A protein has these predicted regions:
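Short, non-transmembrane cytosolic segments of multipass membrane proteins
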Residues: 76-105
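Short alpha-helical linear motifs
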Residues: 63, 78-88, 132-138
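Bilayer-spanning, highly hydrophobic alpha-helical transmembrane segments
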Residues: 10-16, 20, 126-152
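Charged, amphipathic alpha-helical oligomerization/scaffolding segments
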Residues: 37, 44, 91, 110-113, ...
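Membrane-interface, cytosolic juxtamembrane amphipathic helix immediately N-terminal to a transmembrane helix
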Residues: 101-143
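Juxtamembrane/interface alpha-helical elements of multi-pass membrane proteins
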Residues: 2-74
């Protein structure tokens, strides 16, 4: 009976240490997913700037309170009959907040630069996540084994 309880205790220690390491590894992977989501939003922003200049100008004006043609319905935003996702509109507003004047050609160049920087960040974050995940999983498992040996 005592031996069985020791085995169960050791199993719980190993499992909990593994789950702790797995949780830390998952945090790194979530950072990569967040960067990928931001990059996808940036690419959609680039499409909007390229294909809907009139709507973009309206959103730009609405960011500064000089235009009321922006209306939210069912999680989407309608600007002069153009359907944009609400999160994309927020991205646009954040992007336009840094601008003084609207010049769509230079904004496309800015978006391209930002997109390239995000790609580099994603690549480095993926490498960091892979390395850190292995380290956290290995270390947590070794700690679990160490504690288990100490209990025995």
């Amino acid at each position: 009976m005592y031996f069985t309880l020791k085995i169960i205790g050791i199993a719980f220690i190993l499992l909990s240490s593994f789950l702790f390491g797995y949780g830390k590894a998952l945090a790194f992977k979530n950072r990569v997913l967040e960067l990928k989501r931001i990059h996808a939003g940036t690419l959609r922003l680039k499409e909007y700037v390229s294909n809907c200049p009139a709507e973009i100008e309206t959103i730009y004006k609405s960011c500064y309170g000089s235009c009321k043609d922006v209306e939210f319905t069912n999680g989407k935003i309608i600007v002069k009959q153009a359907h944009l996702l609400k999160e994309d509109c927020e991205l646009l507003k954040e992007f336009f907040a840094t601008l003084g004047a609207l010049d769509l050609n230079s904004e496309c160049a800015r978006i391209n630069l930002y997109s390239e920087l995000l790609k580099k960040q994603i690549i480095s974050a993926e490498k960091e996540a892979a390395e850190s995940s292995k380290i956290w999983l290995t270390c947590s498992f070794c700690v679990g084994i160490g504690i288990s040996i100490f209990i025995i």
